[in-house]
Regions:
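Bacterial N-terminal signal peptides that target proteins for export
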Residues: 2-12
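N-terminal signal peptide c-region/cleavage motif recognized by signal peptidases
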Residues: 20-22
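Short beta-strand segments that buttress and anchor functional surface loops
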Residues: 35-38, 91-97, 106, 119-124
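Short, solvent-exposed loop/hinge segments that bridge or flank secondary-structure elements
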Residues: 36-67
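Short, surface-exposed coil-to-beta transition loops
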Residues: 48-49, 100-106, 119-121, 131-136
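Predominantly extracellular/secreted and cell-surface proteins with exposed
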Residues: 56-100
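Edge beta-strand at a domain terminus
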Residues: 124-146
Length: 146
């Protein structure tokens, strides 16, 4: 029997277990997550940033609250102008006016209970200077919280 035939049952079992892992109603499992953010400012890439985060059952049961921005800022008035949440996606857009004029848009895709990808775009003007940024984010569950 060849090595590839020996691995076939293991691969099938791994695939079955991956599908059989119960998903949270909103798409992600609580646990310890590695989040890699790759920013780009005014078209120039900056080094990726990696952080670890323990996501609680409360956070994963309300992905809208967990991944939506807080509309409160200092010296500006912000309004959520677009918002849509499904069990597998979240999109939103926020505009702010005042000392800082800003627009922030986020698009999250909860691919599996253990992985999500996102893009957050920001454009803001301060003292006549406009800055644009784009951050791509990949979150992967790595295990239970320490």
């Amino acid at each position: 029997m060849s090595a590839s035939k020996n691995r076939a049952p293991q691969i099938a079992l791994a695939a079955l277990l991956a599908v059989a892992v119960p998903a949270n109603a909103d798409g992600l499992q609580p646990g310890y997550w590695k989040i890699v953010s790759t920013p780009e400012v005014n078209g120039a890439a900056t080094p990726p940033q990696e952080k670890m985060r323990c996501m609680t059952p409360a956070e994963t049961s309300d992905l809208d609250k967990t991944f939506s921005p807080d509309a409160r800022t200092i010296n500006s008035t912000c309004e959520r102008v677009a918002h849509e949440a499904t069990p597998t996606t979240l999109t939103w857009r926020l505009t702010c006016t005042g000392q800082v004029s800003m627009e922030v848009a986020g698009a999250f895709k909860f691919e599996t209970p253990q992985r999500y990808v996102a893009e957050v775009r920001t454009q803001f003007s301060l003292a006549g200077q406009t800055t644009s940024s784009r951050v791509t984010i990949v979150g992967e569950r790595v295990g239970e919280c320490p």
